Amino acid sequence: MHKFRIPLKPVSFNQAYRRARKGMMISEKGMKFKEDCSDFLREQYTEEKPLKGKLRVRILYQFRDFREKVDIDNQFKLLLDSMKNIVFDDDSQIYKLSGEKQIGMNRNEIH
């Protein structure tokens, strides 16, 4: 089992992508989050190659502010995209995905 800690406030799908002529495009905010996540993952993932085969992924989102109105289902896409080619080859390898959110924590983090 691999565990990662990303000390960033998650960016939702709605913040990360915007409509364009040819469909959806990643926003500047989304691109910055994805790059920062990828950097943290590269630091923590010590294997030479991405994982192969079927994967189970559990994600814990921690938020500081009680006033946060967070739809957990909007949080997965950008994070999983940032893991691609670092932790696994493609998110199609994930056969079980679970997530949890905690609000009122000491810091904004993703585990």
Can you say where each PLM-predicted feature lies in the sequence?
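Acidic, proline/glycine-enriched N-terminal capping motif
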Residues: M1-H111
